[in-house]
């Protein structure tokens, strides 16, 4: 409030003035420090607004107890974009997370003052947040290791036939969201199970598929059994799709029975290879349509040790000296 009395040089007194013409007092005294009544933080992460990964947008909702000038806001120690809401008491600040921020709870700071220039106490803690949770940031992308694809084939677990059970196994360096572990084996969706729960270092997963005659084996030449693994960690960070084993060795599917394409049964008899006497050596040689396990061979009712020949497991030979 103010009051003005005045007199001109001749001694004439003017009417006292104590208000502005057509308005209120020009100066309003404000010595009250403003406060933040709401400081609420959330992420647009699909797995939960208290989680964040690179690319997520963090939103800080700010409400003051009186009009304030545009506040200065940092989120994750970075300058945030600030916009006014319905009035100068309501503000919003946003920041998009990058690979440069540190893992852990996302910090924030609000520096503000009211219209009179009274500085408020910088706000760094939640106030009236709906769930009371800070946002946890995780920029560590999950990675799979020890990825194996094996068959229950007792001779060679790198091969499968119709009826063979193929098992996909792998470890993760982070806890995975079960509903987001998506596995396909031989083009068929499979439900994984956890073989080892999180132990602070890793967790292990497995999925199986039983091969059938419905799968083409490329005319007996065999085909590599395909698989894919898609996965997301608890913070909603997706790992790179995996479609190969760690060793590069997978499973070959072959449902076609082998056949003998060439067979020779000869004696070293000096008169005729079709004749044999005691002491003569009879040799059996076979060539199959594909690589074989060691075949069982007998000559004249006697088991004979045979061996692969020609640098391939498709050709085998065995000999027996007649007695």
Label each residue range with its predicted role:
Residues 2, 58-83, 166-196, 282-308:
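Short, surface-exposed alpha-helix to beta-strand junction/turn motifs within ectodomains of secreted
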Residues 46-56, 154-164, 270-280:
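Short, solvent-exposed loop/linker segments at the N-terminal edge
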Residues 32, 39, 71, 94, ...:
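Tandem-repeat architecture and repeat-register "anchor" residues
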């Amino acid at each position: 409030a103010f009051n003005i009395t005045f007199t001109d040089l001749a001694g004439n007194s003017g009417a006292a003035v104590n208000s502005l013409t057509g308005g209120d007092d020009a100066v309003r005294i404000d010595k009250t420090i403003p406060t933040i009544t709401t400081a609420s933080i959330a992420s647009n992460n699909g797995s939960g607004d208290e989680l964040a990964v690179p690319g997520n947008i963090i939103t800080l909702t700010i409400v003051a107890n009186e009009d304030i000038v545009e506040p200065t806001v940092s989120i994750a120690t970075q300058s945030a974009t600030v916009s006014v809401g319905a009035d100068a008491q309501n503000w919003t600040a946003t920041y998009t997370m990058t690979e440069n921020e540190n893992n852990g709870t996302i910090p924030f700071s609000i520096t503000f003052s009211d219209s009179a220039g009274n500085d408020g106490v910088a706000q760094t803690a939640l106030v009236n947040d709906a769930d009371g949770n800070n946002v946890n940031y995780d920029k560590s992308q999950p990675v799979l290791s020890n990825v194996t694809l094996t068959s229950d084939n007792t001779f060679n677990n790198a091969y499968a036939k119709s009826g063979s059970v193929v098992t996909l196994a792998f470890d993760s360096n982070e806890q995975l969201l079960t509903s987001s572990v998506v596995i396909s084996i031989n083009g068929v969706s499979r439900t994984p199970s956890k073989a080892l729960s999180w132990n602070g270092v890793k967790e292990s997963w497995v999925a199986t598929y039983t091969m059938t005659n419905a799968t083409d084996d490329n005319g007996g030449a065999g085909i590599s059994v395909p698989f894919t693994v898609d996965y997301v960690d608890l913070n909603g960070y997706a790992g790179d799709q995996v479609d190969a084993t760690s060793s590069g060795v997978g499973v070959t599917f072959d449902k076609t029975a082998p056949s003998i394409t060439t067979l020779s049964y000869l004696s070293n008899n000096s008169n005729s290879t079709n004749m044999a006497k005691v002491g003569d050596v009879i040799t059996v040689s076979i060539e199959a349509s594909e690589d074989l396990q060691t075949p069982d061979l007998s000559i004249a009712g006697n088991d004979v040790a045979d061996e692969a020949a020609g640098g391939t497991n498709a050709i085998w030979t065995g000999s027996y000296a007649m007695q």
